[in-house]
């Protein structure tokens, strides 16, 4: 049986609603308020009733009222409700309270019966809940049974692995044929291939991660970049600049600037340059012959234009008969006359053999 707790809680809890003592105090206060209202109205009603009785009955009624008052005084003294100095009006109130207490007691009995029923219902619910929890604790929920795992034999696994190496994906007829040969179902073969493909994928990922973490990074590529400009000045001249080709031959190998520039001054450098040019021209052999005449010009007072005109060689092709004018490769001597490049001992003139290739026209 539940004991009422003296601690007051929120008015919305179940304990406050089902607490019998608080309900009784509440009903008692409510009844006292109603009785006080009746007590305030009772003296007036009693006075009017007594006035009518006194007017109607006369002296006999007065004697009866006196007997009633004496009876009330003796009843009050016997019960001991108050002091001996209380007025008769208070005893009237007690009598009226006793008269009115009948229906109120019935209401209290109904309320108490309802509260007892609610308490019994609550106890029964709690007991049922405790029984359920105990039953649940004793009897655990049955787990959903998993399908038994398919165990493949070594021969089946070997055959599946061999077929997987040959073909990672199987069509429906191929799957059916393989399953029938291995005494398996088509679904089992399909699931095995799916798991095997996923396993291969995971292995590749793990391997790539291991290589990425443990292996050193590859060295950076080095590309040769030619320096074209340094401090605002070109580093490679156009004549000496070489261009890459698939055969490894630069463009400078076919340069036509192999002959130095020639001047018309009276210096030893000009003579040395002329000798070098003659030696280079003699190195080439061809079908063209150049005859340089030995005609001399005037004295020291001759002009350069006259000497140039006198020193124009007459070159004739041995076979064709066409004439080609080639620039003079000789210099001018100190005497002012044109000096031949090559002089023979008998004829006084020499013909050099050369080709047009490698000789730059003047």
Curated annotation (Swiss-Prot):
One of its GO terms (cellular component) is nucleus. Disulfide bonds: none annotated. GO terms for biological process: B cell differentiation; CD4-positive, alpha-beta T cell differentiation; cell fate specification; digestive tract development; gene expression; gland morphogenesis; immune response; leukocyte homeostasis. Expressed in spleen and intestine. Also expressed in salivary gland and tongue. Residues 145-204 bind DNA. It holds the Pfam family Homeodomain. Keywords: Developmental protein, DNA-binding, Homeobox, Nucleus, Transcription, Transcription regulation. Residues 126-149, 203-222 are annotated as: Disordered. Residues 132-141 have a biased composition (Basic and acidic residues). CDD domains: homeodomain. It comes from the Eukaryota. It is found in: Nucleus. One of its GO terms (molecular function) is DNA-binding transcription factor activity, RNA polymerase II-specific. The keyword rRNA-binding does not apply. Belongs to the NK-2 homeobox family. Transcriptional regulator essential for normal development and functions of the small intestine and spleen. Activates directly MADCAM1 expression. Required for homing of lymphocytes in spleen and mucosa-associated lymphoid tissue. May have a role during pharyngeal organogenesis. This is Homeobox protein Nkx-2.3. It comes from Mus musculus (Mouse). The lineage of its organism: Eukaryota, Metazoa, Chordata, Craniata, Vertebrata.
């Amino acid at each position: 049986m539940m004991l009422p707790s003296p601690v007051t809680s929120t008015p919305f809890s179940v304990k406050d609603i089902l607490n019998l003592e608080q309900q009784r105090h509440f009903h008692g206060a409510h009844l006292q308020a109603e009785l006080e209202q009746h007590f305030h109205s009772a003296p007036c009603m009693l006075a009017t009733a007594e006035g009518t009785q006194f007017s109607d009955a006369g002296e006999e009624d007065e004697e009866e009222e006196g007997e009633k008052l004496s009876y009330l005084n003796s009843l009050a003294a016997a019960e001991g409700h108050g002091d001996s100095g209380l007025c008769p009006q208070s005893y009237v109130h007690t009598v009226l309270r006793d008269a009115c207490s009948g229906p109120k007691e019935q209401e209290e009995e109904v309320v108490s019966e309802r509260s007892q029923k609610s308490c019994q219902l609550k106890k029964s619910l709690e007991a049922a809940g405790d029984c359920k929890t105990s039953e649940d604790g004793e009897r655990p929920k049955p787990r959903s049974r998993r399908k038994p795992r398919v165990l493949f034999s070594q021969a089946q696994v070997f055959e599946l692995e061999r077929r997987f190496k040959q073909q990672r994906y199987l069509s429906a007829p191929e799957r059916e044929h393989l399953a029938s040969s291995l005494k398996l179902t088509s679904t089992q073969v399909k699931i095995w291939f799916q798991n095997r493909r996923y396993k291969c994928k995971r292995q590749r990922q793990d391997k790539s991660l291991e290589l990425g973490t443990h292996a050193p990074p590859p060295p950076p590529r080095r590309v040769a970049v030619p320096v074209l400009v340094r401090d605002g000045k070109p580093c490679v001249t156009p004549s000496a600049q070489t261009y890459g080709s698939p055969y490894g031959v630069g463009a400078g190998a076919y340069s036509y600037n192999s002959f130095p520039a020639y001047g018309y001054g009276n210096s030893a450098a000009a003579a040395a340059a002329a000798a070098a040019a003659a030696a280079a021209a003699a190195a080439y052999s061809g079908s063209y012959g150049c005859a340089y005449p030995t005609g001399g010009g005037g004295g020291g007072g001759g002009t350069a234009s006259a000497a140039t005109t006198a020193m124009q060689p007459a070159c004739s092709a041995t076979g064709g008969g066409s004439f080609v004018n080639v620039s003079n490769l000789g210099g001018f001597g100190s005497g002012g006359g044109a000096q031949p490049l090559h002089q023979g001992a008998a004829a006084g003139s020499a013909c050099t053999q050369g080709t047009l290739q490698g000789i730059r026209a003047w």
